[in-house]
Curated annotation (Swiss-Prot):
InterPro entries: GPAT/DHAPAT (IPR022284), GPAT/DHAPAT_C (IPR045520), GPAT/DHAPAT_LPLAT (IPR041728), GPAT_PlsB (IPR028354), Plipid/glycerol_acylTrfase (IPR002123). This is Glycerol-3-phosphate acyltransferase. The lineage of its organism: Bacteria, Pseudomonadati, Pseudomonadota, Gammaproteobacteria, Alteromonadales. It is a peripheral membrane protein. Keywords: Acyltransferase, Cell inner membrane, Cell membrane, Lipid biosynthesis, Lipid metabolism, Membrane, Phospholipid biosynthesis, Phospholipid metabolism, Transferase.
Length: 807
């Protein structure tokens, strides 16, 4: 009988099982790490430990992976399923040598030399009992519980106190066949593997626990000694005619207002609360792209998360997901409005640092904040901030606020050695609890000040909110971005590091636009967003169930056949299943009669559902534009279709932060998908299929409100080509209000003055709005926009314009 089958070992494992709760990273190793169940597998661990292997045994049984106690047998030769770099550490004396590790590796390499078809997967496994990074001023608790290589006595204490926070992390498998073919199979290679594995485990631990936590007061004193803050304090004293000591006290007050006070203990408590909260609120959280972010951390990147901002839940959701995905929750830039009791102190201990909405020319505050941000980057803490500056009230991305991006880029320019990488993050929900409040604010109600009563009120209303979605977009490494935009930026900055480069502002603006585009590139199409997309394009926000299911199936086919990007995600299931989910979430209403079943959006929810549609409208706006062209013209050449789409795309791109890199190829792929779905026929001459016109009409409805806006703007410019930008925004908004009232447009963004301001800015960039504007170009796009509208809508615009001129 082997040792692990003895009564003693089984008893120890049973006791440990009662004390330990294990979280697996990633949650599905087969899918996330591409493990091949048909190939032999060997686990590699850093240190031999009875308790670690017992914890691994419990998890492998649940995941369907081989047990670490099960020997690997190949052609009658048995080898251990687990190899450890280091032997056990005794209570006294030296740890065992790593000779067994080297012998096992040499044996495995020899098997590959003898059998050319053999390919064993080496899977590194890291175990953590708690994730405390330690502090710069180490405590007795840290000395007992936070050692990287504990003795068996310390390990017993760790299991007792930290067993409920046990993490088992699997890493991407290494092919021993590849190692043998590339590097040979002698003893030297076994030593090399050991060195590489040690580096891997050291980096992996840093990713899981993060850098050591600073003493807050010691950090303040260190920051106050920096040259930049000394200079700012002296200038503050001089400009306000106060003593430097008084200015220094003000700087300390600013630091105390701003700085986080991260507590690992609070994070562990919050993890339990948030697990309860998510299980009560959501039926699951869909995550895409976490592995690439783990790899960036592993490679030593300084990570800055830049998510979209839908809800106050965003602060909690991303940190929770990162924690469960084996990464350290970031330090989050939170608005000072959230610094209210008791949430403010808890947010601060959870890693939030607070920022004023406006610095108002306060040079000392600006200097303090910059130095604090530089310190976070220098110490290696990941950071998170919302580039929109506030929560979106319409479901679309807001125009970015560039302040934090500018400060981050300035930190890079001042000489951060490690690569600093922005990670765009798309956050989505089947239900956003603040949506009703957003629409009240858009209709003119004053925004309520955040308070503890709002929090209690929200918790009281907790219910079934469906699923949450966290998609990580394509990262942007800032050093590479700077080189792309300003190839010789290092040389220019080196000449005078204190001088703001002339190119910084346009580069920051370009960076902000790329961040927003890559957030939208990672959008998540869900049951709620797809159902709202279809029903809001129908006449009365209602369709026969079969028709709704077919339309959703069409949209699913478009998204899967012609992916918007590889970072976007599409919910699982078919049209029928997605409609069922919408009904279950009380987003859709089902009405049955003798003729069948009608699915509708209740009138009280119609405006709210535009929010969810807007989350993914950019995924469908070009397919919708193609459908509109086919419905209005019935027959069109492929070349004419390409020209029409290309004409409107710059405006769509600016408004919706779209990132289609090869527009003609994307349009051609969509045309082929339309043909395969039976919506249109032809090759060079494209014709709509009459029997499928209802599906095309519903799809065309997605871009309908957008085309109305463009028609308003270009009809105004057609009448007055040299109209001032402010006048264009004013008259566009007035005309939109009238058009919406007559034709029942209820989407809040249709009346959003900020959207018309954004469009007028882009029109100026494109040459439509200037003293030298090309009148023929303006009239051409006006005629095309008018030609894509229903005649009644077009007539309303023209009559209203004529009436204004008569007045």
């Amino acid at each position: 009988m082997s040792a692990h089958e003895s009564f003693w070992f089984k008893s120890l494992r049973w006791i440990q099982k009662q004390l330990v709760h294990t979280i697996v990273v990633p949650q599905d190793p087969f899918a996330d790490l591409n493990l091949d169940p048909s190939r032999p597998l060997v686990y590699v661990m850093k240190t031999e430990s009875v308790s670690d292997i017992a914890a691994l045994h419990e998890i492998t049984g649940k995941l369907g992976l081989p047990s670490p106690y099960q020997m690997l047998e190949i052609d009658g030769i048995k080898t251990p399923r687990v190899v450890c770099l280091e032997g056990r550490k005794p209570l006294f004396g030296k740890r065992d040598s790593n000779e067994p590790f080297l012998q096992t590796f040499q044996q495995l390499l020899a098997l590959h030399r003898q059998q050319q078809e053999l390919d064993i997967q080496l899977v590194p496994v890291s175990l953590y009992w708690g994730r405390t990074p330690g502090k710069e001023d180490d405590t007795m608790r840290a000395a007992v519980l936070e050692r990287e290589d504990p003795t068996w006595l310390r390990k017993c204490l760790m299991i007792l106190f930290l067993g409920r926070h046990n993490f088992v992390q699997f890493s991407r498998a290494v092919s021993l066949r590849h190692m043998a073919d590339e590097h040979g199979t002698d003893k030297r290679i076994a030593h090399k593997l050991a060195r590489v594995a040690r580096v891997h485990f050291r980096r992996q631990r840093k990713v899981m626990t993060g850098p050591v936590l600073p003493n807050r007061q010691a950090m303040f004193h260190a920051l106050l000694k920096s040259d930049n803050l000394k200079k700012a304090i002296a200038e503050e004293a001089s400009s306000k005619k106060i003593s430097e000591e008084k200015a220094r006290e003000t700087a300390i007050q600013y630091l105390d207002e701003i700085a986080a006070d991260y507590s690992d203990s609070l994070v562990r408590i919050a993890e339990r609360f948030l697990t309860w909260l998510w299980n009560k609120l959501y039926k699951g959280i869909s995550i895409k792209g976490a592995e690439q972010i783990r790899q960036l951390h592993h490679d030593g990147h300084e990570i800055v998360y830049v998510p979209c901002h839908r809800s106050h839940m965003d602060y909690l959701l991303l940190s929770y997901i990162l924690y469960y995905e084996g990464m350290v929750p970031p330090h989050i830039a939170a608005g000072i409005n959230l610094n209210f009791w008791p949430a403010g102190p808890m947010f601060r201990r959870g890693g939030a640092f607070f920022i004023r909405r406006s610095f108002n020319g306060n040079k000392l505050y600006t200097a303090v904040f910059r130095e604090y941000l530089d310190q976070l980057f220098a110490k290696g803490y990941s950071v998170e901030y919302f580039t929109e500056g506030g929560r979106s009230r319409t479901g679309r991305l807001l125009a970015p606020k560039t302040g934090m991006l500018a400060m981050t880029l300035s930190s890079v320019i001042r000489g951060i050695e490690r690569p600093v990488t922005l990670v765009p993050v798309y956050l989505g929900y089947d239900h956003v609890m603040e949506v009703a409040t957003y629409h009240k604010e858009l209709s003119g109600k004053k925004k309520e000040k955040e308070s503890v009563w709002q929090v209690f009120g929200a918790i009281r209303k907790l219910g079934n909110f469906g699923r949450g979605y966290v998609n990580f977009g394509q990262p942007i490494t800032l050093q590479n971005f700077l080189t792309e935009k300003v190839p010789n930026w290092r040389e220019e900055v080196g000449e005078d590091p204190e001088q703001k480069p002339s190119w910084l502002t346009p580069v920051v603006n370009a960076l902000a636009n790329r961040v927003m585009t890559r957030i939208n590139d990672a959008a998540a199409a869900s049951s709620v967003t797809l159902s709202s997309m279809v029903l809001l394009a129908s006449e009365q926000n209602a369709l026969e169930r079969n028709q709704l299911e077919r339309q959703i199936d069409l949209y699913l086919s478009l998204l899967k056949s012609v992916p918007y990007t590889s970072y976007a995600s599409v919910t699982e299931g078919c049209g029928k299943e997605l409609v069922d989910r919408g009904i279950e979430l009380n987003k859709l209403t089902e009405t049955k009669d003798d003729l069948g079943t009608i699915i509708s959006i209740d009138d009280s929810l119609a405006i709210s559902m535009t929010y969810y549609r807007n989350n993914i409208i950019h995924l469908f706006v070009i397919p919708s534009l193609i459908a509109t062209v086919m419905v209005r013209h019935e027959e069109v050449s492929r070349e004419e279709l390409q020209e029409l789409v290309a004409e409107f795309y710059p405006l769509l791109k600016a408004e919706l932060f779209m990132g289609v890199t090869d527009l003609p190829a994307y349009v051609d792929a969509l045309v082929e998908c339309f043909k395969s779905e039976g919506l249109i026929t032809g090759d060079n001459r494209l014709k709509l299929v009459d029997d499928r016109i209802n599906q095309l009409l519903l799809l065309a409805g997605v871009v309908g409100e957008t085309l109305k806006r463009y028609a308003i703007i270009f009809n105004l410019l057609g009448e007055q080509p040299r109209m001032e930008r402010a006048d264009l925004e004013h008259h566009s908004h007035r005309l939109a209000s009238r058009l919406g009232a007559i034709h029942g447009v209820m989407a809040p963004e249709f009346y959003d003055k900020k959207l018309y301001a954004l469009l007028s800015s882009k029109l100026k960039d494109l040459g439509y709005l200037s003293d030298k504007a090309d009148g023929d170009k303006v009239r051409k796009i006006r005629d095309h926009a008018n030609g894509l509208l229903r005649s009644s809508v077009r007539q309303t615009i023209i009559e209203t314009l004529n009436q204004e001129q008569d007045d």
